[in-house]
Amino acid sequence: MTAEPPQSDRSLLHVSGLDAGYGEMQVLRKVSLDVRPAEIVAMVGGNGAGKTTMLRAISRLIPSRGKIHFNGRSLARATADDVFAMGLVQVPEGRQLFDRMSVEENLRMGAYRRRDADGIAHDLDRMYAIFPKLAERRSQLAGSMSGGEQQMCAMARALMARPRLMMVDEMSLGLAPVIVDLLLDTMTKIRNEGVTVLLVEQDVHAALSVADRGYVMETGEIVREGSARALESDPEVQRAYLGDVTGAT
């Protein structure tokens, strides 16, 4: 029998043999992945690869088969609310803000389970420091903001829950490159403060530019995994997702 790995080497999120889908349509096939504490892991692949389905299964929003462990605990019997309470929080594709509520009201919704008023006030100030645009817009209706500002609000709302793991779905979708770069820089700062990130992205270059490790998903299966730098230099990944990078500087 092998010895238990030291605590620092254990995964915060461990997924093994995950199958999931919708009704009779199977989308995921034997998906396995690990996310260790205080790292950014990218799950990349094209539209329809199954990445969002994977997040929904991990969040217990859809039924699945296989093993999911978070912080050493099985999620087999967990509800979506249980998962949120454990500190596994999702930033959904399309932001899904409360459009007719103010920015600050949206942020407070992220802290709806919390009862520490002083801590919530402190975290609101922290979110406004991380995302200065939100401080300017705190009383504005969330639905009236630009796409980039809405993505900032969605990320800040998730952080108000004080997550251990933040799963971000298609952060770059529909955003200008300069806004994507700003959000990626912010994600790195968040990771450096101890929040683990699982980033699901079609923009492979953007995701791998900030990730420590990555996985490539195609038609519901993991087809490649490794360090972000190794995936960036993989000829098959370059050909399929990064275009002609020959001679790039």
Indicate residue ranges for each PLM-predicted region.
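Glycine-rich phosphate-binding loops of nucleotide-dependent enzymes
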Residues: 2-249
